[in-house]
Amino acid sequence: QGCCGEPNLCFTRWCRNNARCCRQQ
């Protein structure tokens, strides 16, 4: 669980599921 905190992780498997979270950055 580092998607929200690290933009570099936004395209990893679990972050693709949480794309909303990454877009908020």
UniProtKB/Swiss-Prot annotation:
One of its GO terms (molecular function) is sodium channel regulator activity. The modification Pyrrolidone carboxylic acid is found at Q1. The keyword Membrane does not apply. The keyword Phosphoprotein does not apply. Expressed by the venom duct. The lineage of its organism: Eukaryota, Metazoa, Spiralia, Lophotrochozoa, Mollusca. This is Mu-conotoxin CnIIIB. It is found in: Secreted. Keywords: Disulfide bond, Ion channel impairing toxin, Neurotoxin, Pyrrolidone carboxylic acid, Secreted, Toxin, Voltage-gated sodium channel impairing toxin. The cysteine framework is III (CC-C-C-CC).
